[in-house]
Regions:
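Cofactor-binding active-site loop characterized by glycine-rich and histidine/acidic residues
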Residues: 1-74
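Gly-rich Lys/Arg/Thr-decorated short loops/hinges at beta-loop-alpha junctions or inter-strand turns
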Residues: 11-22, 47-49, 83-92, 112-120, ...
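A short, conserved beta-to-alpha structural element at the edge of catalytic cores
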Residues: 23-24, 73-100
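Acidic, glycine-rich active-site loops and adjacent beta-strand->loop/helix elements
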Residues: 53-60, 84-90, 123-125, 175-177
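Acidic, Ser/Thr-rich peripheral helices and adjacent loops at domain boundaries
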Residues: 98-110, 187
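Glycine/aspartate-rich loop-and-adjacent alpha/beta segment that forms the canonical ThDP
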Residues: 108, 126-187
Length: 187
């Protein structure tokens, strides 16, 4: 019964499933998860509140403008950490930011007040010779996969420390959807 309150028609826009978004829930098409993270950060300034964001909705202005508005209002609150999964695809089409290069993506976040942008690009670790800007890390050999995984873990650790130390920070992980539901790209 509780889930009925959170369905799109009478509850949170974009949550058709009725699942109540948590702090680590994906941001969804209009970035609801990020608002829970920002609220948590405001209320509990000694804890980190990460939220995941997919690039499928990043073409919408709401996600980054909400971060910028929040930072303008509460510049001292930086203990929330967006983690962007940048894979070039929405569920059914290319994402609006799929044609950006790394420098443009970094500039996009910096334009919205993010002082530190930590971008981990799987392409930098590709030992399988994949073409295109987005590569599938599940095709890497063992050493390349370990190096990429290490870079992600170290990047997230550095980002967490940065966010908890008063610097507005984002982590961006750039790789093709390669495993799970999307066996190859976003087919």
């Amino acid at each position: 019964q509780l889930q009925e309150r959170f369905r799109e028609r009478d509850g949170l826009l974009g949550h058709l499933s009725g699942a109540i978004p948590g702090l680590l829930a994906p941001a969804g098409p209009l970035g609801q998860g990020q608002h829970f993270a920002m609220a948590g950060a405001y209320l509990h300034r000694d804890r980190l509140f990460p939220c995941t964001i997919g690039d499928g909705g990043l073409g919408e202005p709401y996600i980054l403008s909400a971060f910028k508005h929040f930072h303008t209002s509460y510049p001292e609150v930086t203990n929330f950490l967006p983690v962007l999964i940048w894979n070039g695809f929405s569920q059914e089409h290319h994402s609006m930011v799929s044609l950006m290069d790394n420098e443009q993506m970094v500039a996009y976040w910096r334009a919205h007040d993010f002082e530190r942008v930590i971008l981990i690009d799987a392409k930098d670790y590709d030992d399988a010779g994949q073409e295109g800007a987005y590569v599938d890390s599940t095709r890497f050999g063992p050493e390349a996969r370990r190096a990429f995984t290490r870079a992600v873990l170290e990047g997230v650790k550095a980002a967490a420390d940065s966010a908890l130390s008063g610097t507005l920070t984002v982590v961006i992980v750039k790789q093709l959807k390669g495993a799970g539901v999307h066996a190859q790209g976003a087919k």
